Curated annotation (Swiss-Prot):
<feature type="binding site">
    <location>
        <position position="128"/>
    </location>
    <ligand>
        <name>Mg(2+)</name>
    </ligand>
</feature>
<comment type="subunit">
    <text>Homodimer.</text>
</comment>
<dbReference type="GO" id="GO:0005737">
    <property type="term" value="C:cytoplasm"/>
</dbReference>
<dbReference type="GO" id="GO:0046872">
    <property type="term" value="F:metal ion binding"/>
</dbReference>
<dbReference type="GO" id="GO:0019843">
    <property type="term" value="F:rRNA binding"/>
</dbReference>
<dbReference type="GO" id="GO:0008033">
    <property type="term" value="P:tRNA processing"/>
</dbReference>
<keyword id="KW-0479">Metal-binding</keyword>
<feature type="active site">
    <location>
        <position position="131"/>
    </location>
</feature>
<keyword id="KW-0698">rRNA processing</keyword>
<dbReference type="InterPro" id="IPR011907">
    <property type="entry name" value="RNase_III"/>
</dbReference>
<dbReference type="InterPro" id="IPR000999">
    <property type="entry name" value="RNase_III_dom"/>
</dbReference>
<feature type="domain" description="DRBM">
    <location>
        <begin position="272"/>
        <end position="341"/>
    </location>
</feature>
<feature type="binding site">
    <location>
        <position position="131"/>
    </location>
    <ligand>
        <name>Mg(2+)</name>
    </ligand>
</feature>
<keyword id="KW-0255">Endonuclease</keyword>
<keyword id="KW-0378">Hydrolase</keyword>
<comment type="function">
    <text>Digests double-stranded RNA. Involved in the processing of primary rRNA transcript to yield the immediate precursors to the large and small rRNAs (23S and 16S). Processes some mRNAs, and tRNAs when they are encoded in the rRNA operon. Processes pre-crRNA and tracrRNA of type II CRISPR loci if present in the organism.</text>
</comment>
<feature type="active site">
    <location>
        <position position="50"/>
    </location>
</feature>
C-alpha cells in the first residue's frame, strides 16, 4: 500500500495507527508471507479481531434489547432471537460486503497462487480482512476499548445489506404495523461487457432474501436505492451503493421513529430535552444518546463548554455554553427537535424503466430480479 492507500484505510475506519506495520500486516495473507518469510501474516490478528467483534456486537445488542428491572435482567428478545440477530450482524456475508463496499480487498498482499485464483473476491478472505483490521487496531491501541468500540461501530456502519440499521428498520416496521420493508435497488443494464465489471456492479440482497445487481445511473454517475415501508417510499442517492443505501435507510429509520413517537407520546417535553431523550431510550424508541464534553476558553479567557450529543442513525449535534449543565440541554434540544420535527423526504412515485443511450434503467416492482 502507498501513503494514499494507507490514509484512505485509516480515514475509513476512523483510526490513526501509531505503528503502520500492524496495519499492513492486517492486509497480509499467509500465501504472501510464505513467499516473504521476513513478514508476518494476518491470521493471529484475525483471531483477536473476531473475539473483539463478538464482544462488541453482544454488548450492542444488550444495550438495545435488555435492561435491569426490579433487580433482574429483562429482554425484549429471547435467546433464540438474539442468536439469530447476532449471526446476521457478524455473518461472513455481512463482513465481506463491508470490505467489498469500501474497496479494501484491492489492498491485500497475496501470494502468486492467490492472485492467480483471485481470492480477493472470496467472502472468507474479506471476512478475515475485516477481523484482522480490528485485531491490528487492538494491538496498536493496547486494547483501549473506547477506541475499539469506535472502530467496530464505524466498520459495521460501512452498510452491508444485513447491517444493524437494516435490522432496526425491519424491527420497527413490523412492530408499528407496516410489515416487511422492501429493499429495491435501481439497476442499469448494457450490452457492453466492459460495463459489467466488479467495480461497476454490486450484488446485494433485496430485503433479506433474493439477489439483484445495481450500477451507476449513466446520466448522473450516482447510485440510487429505494426502500418502501408500507406505502411510504424513500430514495437514497450516493457516490457508491453503500452510501445510497445508507441515505435511503436513514430516511426510513427516521420516519419510523417519528411514527413510534406519535403512537407512544401525546406531547414531548422540550423543557428538559436530555430527560426526554433518556425516556425515549428507556422506551426503546431510540438508541442511547452519547455525550462528549470539551472545555475551552474564549478570547477573554472565560471557560466555555462544548457538548456533542451523538445518536446512532442520526449523527452529532453540538452546542456551546458557559454552563456544562446547560450545554447538555442545548445539544439535546437540537437533537430532540431534529428527531421529532424534521420533515422526512419521501418519494411519491418511483419512475418506470426508461432508456438512456442504449442503457436500460430497470426497476423491479416486485423486488425481484
Amino acid at each position: 500500500m502507498n501513503r494514499q492507500d494507507i490514509g484512505f484505510v485509516q480515514s475509513s475506519i476512523n483510526y490513526q495507527f501509531k505503528n503502520l506495520q500492524l496495519l499492513e500486516q492486517a492486509f497480509t495473507r499467509k500465501s504472501y508471507s510464505e513467499e516473504h518469510p521476513e513478514l508476518q501474516n494476518n491470521e493471529v490478528l484475525e483471531f483477536y479481531g473476531d473475539e473483539i467483534l463478538d464482544f462488541f456486537v453482544t454488548k450492542m445488542m444488550y444495550k438495545r434489547f435488555s435492561r435491569i428491572l426490579n433487580n433482574e435482567l429483562v429482554s425484549e428478545k429471547n435467546e433464540g432471537e438474539l442468536t439469530k440477530l447476532k449471526s446476521i450482524l457478524v455473518s461472513k456475508e455481512s463482513l465481506a460486503r463491508c470490505m467489498y463496499n469500501i474497496g479494501f480487498s484491492k489492498f491485500l498482499y497475496l501470494g502468486k497462487s492467490d492472485e492467480k485464483n483471485e481470492v480477493y473476491k472470496s467472502k472468507s478472505v474479506n471476512e478475515d480482512l475485516f477481523e484482522a483490521i480490528i485485531g491490528a487496531v487492538a494491538a496498536d491501541c493496547d486494547w483501549n476499548y473506547e477506541k475499539l468500540e469506535k472502530v467496530c461501530r464505524t466498520m459495521l456502519d460501512m452498510e452491508t445489506t444485513n447491517g444493524y440499521l437494516a435490522l432496526l428498520v425491519k424491527e420497527k416496521s413490523h412492530r408499528l404495523g407496516f410489515g416487511e420493508p422492501c429493499y429495491r435497488p435501481f439497476a442499469w443494464q448494457t450490452d457492453n461487457p466492459e460495463d459489467w465489471q466488479s467495480d461497476n456492479l454490486f450484488n446485494m440482497g433485496i430485503g433479506f432474501g433474493g439477489f439483484g445487481s445495481t450500477s451507476k445511473n449513466p446520466k448522473t454517475g450516482k447510485h440510487e436505492y429505494g426502500i418502501q415501508v408500507g406505502e411510504n417510499k424513500f430514495t437514497g442517492i450516493g457516490d457508491g451503493i453503500a452510501q445510497a443505501k445508507l441515505n435511503a435507510e436513514q430516511k426510513a429509520y427516521h420516519f419510523l421513529i417519528q411514527e413510534e413517537i406519535k403512537q407512544q407520546f401525546q406531547n414531548l417535553d422540550y423543557t428538559n430535552p436530555a430527560s426526554t431523550l433518556h425516556e425515549l431510550f428507556q422506551k426503546k424508541v431510540i438508541m442511547e444518546v452519547r455525550y462528549e464534553f470539551n472545555e475551552y476558553h474564549d478570547e477573554n479567557g472565560n471557560p466555555i463548554w462544548n457538548c456533542k450529543a451523538i445518536l446512532e442513525g442520526y449523527g452529532t449535534f453540538e452546542a456551546d455554553n458557559a454552563s456544562k449543565k446547560q450545554v447538555k440541554q442545548d445539544a439535546s434540544l437540537k437533537l430532540l427537535k431534529f428527531i421529532a420535527k424534521t420533515k422526512i423526504e419521501q418519494t411519491e412515485k418511483w419512475e418506470i424503466p426508461t432508456f438512456y443511450h442504449g442503457m436500460a434503467r430497470i426497476w423491479h416492482d416486485e423486488g425481484k430480479i
